[in-house]
Amino acid sequence: MALIYTNTLLAFTISLLGLLLYRSHLMSSLLCLEGMMLSMFVMVAVMILNTHLTTSSMMPIVLLVFAACEAALGLSLLVMVSNTYGIDHVQNLNLLQC
Protein backbone atom coordinates (compact mmCIF):
# COMPACT_ATOMS: atom_id res chain seq x y z
CA MET A 1 0.00 0.00 0.00
CA ALA A 2 2.89 2.37 0.57
CA LEU A 3 3.70 2.15 -3.14
CA ILE A 4 0.23 3.45 -4.04
CA TYR A 5 0.59 6.37 -1.63
CA THR A 6 4.04 7.15 -3.00
CA ASN A 7 2.87 7.06 -6.61
CA THR A 8 -0.15 9.28 -6.01
CA LEU A 9 1.92 11.75 -4.00
CA LEU A 10 4.49 11.78 -6.80
CA ALA A 11 1.74 12.36 -9.38
CA PHE A 12 0.36 15.24 -7.32
CA THR A 13 3.82 16.77 -6.92
CA ILE A 14 4.62 16.47 -10.62
CA SER A 15 1.28 18.07 -11.53
CA LEU A 16 1.89 20.89 -9.05
CA LEU A 17 5.39 21.41 -10.44
CA GLY A 18 3.98 21.45 -13.97
CA LEU A 19 1.40 24.02 -12.90
CA LEU A 20 4.12 26.23 -11.42
CA LEU A 21 6.61 25.89 -14.28
CA TYR A 22 4.49 25.68 -17.44
CA ARG A 23 1.91 28.36 -16.83
CA SER A 24 2.19 30.21 -20.12
CA HIS A 25 -0.87 28.56 -21.73
CA LEU A 26 -4.23 28.11 -20.07
CA MET A 27 -4.71 24.62 -21.51
CA SER A 28 -1.52 23.29 -19.91
CA SER A 29 -2.55 24.81 -16.59
CA LEU A 30 -5.95 23.12 -16.81
CA LEU A 31 -4.33 19.76 -17.60
CA CYS A 32 -2.05 20.08 -14.58
CA LEU A 33 -5.02 20.95 -12.37
CA GLU A 34 -6.87 17.87 -13.65
CA GLY A 35 -3.83 15.72 -12.85
CA MET A 36 -3.80 17.12 -9.33
CA MET A 37 -7.50 16.41 -8.87
CA LEU A 38 -7.13 12.86 -10.19
CA SER A 39 -4.27 12.08 -7.83
CA MET A 40 -6.25 13.57 -4.92
CA PHE A 41 -9.23 11.38 -5.87
CA VAL A 42 -7.08 8.24 -5.90
CA MET A 43 -5.46 9.16 -2.58
CA VAL A 44 -8.80 9.82 -0.85
CA ALA A 45 -10.37 6.65 -2.26
CA VAL A 46 -7.46 4.46 -1.16
CA MET A 47 -7.37 6.08 2.27
CA ILE A 48 -11.10 5.46 2.79
CA LEU A 49 -10.74 1.85 1.65
CA ASN A 50 -7.84 1.25 4.02
CA THR A 51 -9.44 2.80 7.08
CA HIS A 52 -12.95 1.37 6.43
CA LEU A 53 -14.64 4.69 7.16
CA THR A 54 -18.26 4.38 6.14
CA THR A 55 -19.17 7.91 7.17
CA SER A 56 -16.89 9.51 4.60
CA SER A 57 -17.49 7.11 1.72
CA MET A 58 -19.11 9.89 -0.34
CA MET A 59 -15.98 12.07 -0.20
CA PRO A 60 -14.47 10.79 -3.49
CA ILE A 61 -17.77 11.47 -5.28
CA VAL A 62 -17.85 15.02 -3.92
CA LEU A 63 -14.26 15.49 -5.06
CA LEU A 64 -15.18 14.30 -8.56
CA VAL A 65 -18.11 16.74 -8.65
CA PHE A 66 -15.80 19.63 -7.77
CA ALA A 67 -13.29 18.45 -10.39
CA ALA A 68 -16.00 18.38 -13.05
CA CYS A 69 -17.17 21.88 -12.13
CA GLU A 70 -13.59 23.14 -12.20
CA ALA A 71 -13.02 21.59 -15.62
CA ALA A 72 -16.23 23.05 -17.03
CA LEU A 73 -15.42 26.54 -15.77
CA GLY A 74 -11.84 26.31 -17.00
CA LEU A 75 -12.84 25.15 -20.46
CA SER A 76 -15.50 27.84 -20.76
CA LEU A 77 -12.90 30.45 -19.78
CA LEU A 78 -10.50 28.98 -22.33
CA VAL A 79 -13.13 29.18 -25.10
CA MET A 80 -14.06 32.74 -24.15
CA VAL A 81 -10.44 33.96 -24.08
CA SER A 82 -9.47 32.21 -27.31
CA ASN A 83 -12.58 33.52 -29.12
CA THR A 84 -12.04 37.05 -27.87
CA TYR A 85 -8.27 37.43 -28.17
CA GLY A 86 -7.25 34.54 -30.42
CA ILE A 87 -4.63 33.20 -27.96
CA ASP A 88 -4.78 31.30 -24.69
CA HIS A 89 -1.91 32.84 -22.77
CA VAL A 90 -2.39 33.16 -19.03
CA GLN A 91 -1.00 36.71 -19.09
CA ASN A 92 -4.17 37.87 -20.91
CA LEU A 93 -6.46 36.76 -18.10
CA ASN A 94 -6.05 40.08 -16.28
CA LEU A 95 -7.72 41.73 -19.30
CA LEU A 96 -11.02 40.12 -18.25
CA GLN A 97 -11.45 42.48 -15.31
CA CYS A 98 -14.28 45.00 -15.55
Curated annotation (Swiss-Prot):
UniProt enzyme class: translocase
Single GO cellular component term: respiratory chain complex I
GO BP term (any one): ATP synthesis coupled electron transport
Subcellular location: Mitochondrion inner membrane
Assigned keywords, A-Z: Electron transport, Membrane, Mitochondrion, Mitochondrion inner membrane, NAD, Respiratory chain, Translocase, Transmembrane, Transmembrane helix, Transport, Ubiquinone
Catalytic activity: a ubiquinone + NADH + 5 H(+)(in) = a ubiquinol + NAD(+) + 4 H(+)(out)
Residue ranges crossing the lipid bilayer per the database entry: 1-21, 29-49, 61-81
Membrane topology label: Multi-pass membrane protein
Role according to the record: Core subunit of the mitochondrial membrane respiratory chain NADH dehydrogenase (Complex I) which catalyzes electron transfer from NADH through the respiratory chain, using ubiquinone as an electron acceptor. Part of the enzyme membrane arm which is embedded in the lipid bilayer and involved in proton translocation.
Quaternary structure note: Core subunit of respiratory chain NADH dehydrogenase (Complex I) which is composed of 45 different subunits.
PANTHER family reported for this sequence: NADH-UBIQUINONE OXIDOREDUCTASE CHAIN 4L, NADH-UBIQUINONE OXIDOREDUCTASE SUBUNIT ND4L
Family: Belongs to the complex I subunit 4L family.
Protein name listed in UniProt: NADH-ubiquinone oxidoreductase chain 4L
Species annotation: Rhinolophus monoceros
Gene: MT-ND4L
